């Protein structure tokens, strides 16, 4: 028990000092699935997201899976027609789309016109900055009431949340989640890292 406490303390401290990898490349330790667990598989060191709607919520020890001011970067590859998303400031929900936080869109060729790094339904971009079947870095920073998204270092969204927003889609302490959108979508995540500020 003492060793577990020391490990958790170290992970929490080290997350404040550097980037911490949340995917281990072997299994889904530290993550919790909703709706359709089979939509999330680890294959050849990558998280493969393919199947019916579901969400994979980070539920591990880093930051006690509740982040306030933080950065996330993920290495992502989409396949033709795929749609996914990376939620921030969210909370576990057993069914349906997460009702808290914001979704950062992952979509380079799906019929939904909102493209990768859009702050879904809030600040959307139709510009396609990366292509299917190539790895790219998706970066998100949440600080105070400010969200920034980038693709391969290029800023896509620079959003300041209006004062007084109290419900649903708002910046609040929470976890991150990866979306399985539909059975025709296939996305791979090679790395998901977080840095607590």
Descriptions of predicted regions:
Residues 1-3, 17-18:
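Absolute protein N-terminus
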Residues 17-197:
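Carbohydrate-interacting regions of secretory-pathway proteins
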Residues 3-13:
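Sec-dependent N-terminal signal peptides
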């Amino acid at each position: 028990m003492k060793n577990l406490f020391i490990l958790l303390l170290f992970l929490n401290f080290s997350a404040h000092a550097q980037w911490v990898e949340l995917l281990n490349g072997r299994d889904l330790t530290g993550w919790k699935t909703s709706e359709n667990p089979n939509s999330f598989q680890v294959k050849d060191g990558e998280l493969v997201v393919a199947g019916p709607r579901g969400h994979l919520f980070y539920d591990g020890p880093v930051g006690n899976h509740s982040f306030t001011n933080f950065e996330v970067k993920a290495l992502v590859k989409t396949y033709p027609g795929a749609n996914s998303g990376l939620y921030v400031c969210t909370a576990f929900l057993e069914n349906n789309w997460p009702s808290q936080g914001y979704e950062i869109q992952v979509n380079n060729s799906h019929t939904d016109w909102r493209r990768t790094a859009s702050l879904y339904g809030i600040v959307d971009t139709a510009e396609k900055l990366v292509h299917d079947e190539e790895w790219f870095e998706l970066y998100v920073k949440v600080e105070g009431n400010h969200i920034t998204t980038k693709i391969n270092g290029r800023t896509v969204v620079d959003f300041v949340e209006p004062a007084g927003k109290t419900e649903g889609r708002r910046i609040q302490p929470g976890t991150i989640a990866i979306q399985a959108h539909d059975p025709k979508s296939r996305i791979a995540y090679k790395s998901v890292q977080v840095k607590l500020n």
